[in-house]
Amino acid sequence: GIDPNYRSLPVVKEEQGVKIYGTYEPPTKLGIWGTIVGVDFDLCIADGSCINA
C-alpha cells in the first residue's frame, strides 16, 4: 500500500493546487498526489489500496 509517511517526501510539483510527492517522471513515474487524501498513481490498480485518507 501507500507509504503512510509520504508527506515527508519532497514536493516535486504542484498541479492545479495538488501537491505531488516523490518521483515524478511521466509517463512511468507519477508520484503520490494529494495532502489530505494521498493517491499513489504508481501503485493504483483501482482496488482502493492506493488511497490513504
Swiss-Prot record:
Chain spans, region N-terminal extension: 1-35
Needed cofactors: [3Fe-4S] cluster; [4Fe-4S] cluster
Annotated function: Ferredoxins are iron-sulfur proteins that transfer electrons in a wide variety of metabolic reactions.
Organism for this UniProt entry: Sulfuracidifex metallicus
Keyword hit for Iron: yes
Cofactor, how bound (note): Binds 1 [3Fe-4S] cluster. Binds 1 [4Fe-4S] cluster.
Name of the molecule in the record: Ferredoxin B
Residues that hold [3Fe-4S] cluster according to the record: C44, C50
Domain 4Fe-4S ferredoxin-type intervals: 34-53
Keywords carried by this UniProt record: 3Fe-4S, 4Fe-4S, Electron transport, Iron, Iron-sulfur, Metal-binding, Methylation, Repeat, Transport
Domain of life: Archaea
Annotated GO MF terms: 3 iron, 4 sulfur cluster binding; 4 iron, 4 sulfur cluster binding; metal ion binding
Modified positions (N6-methyllysine) in chain numbering: K29
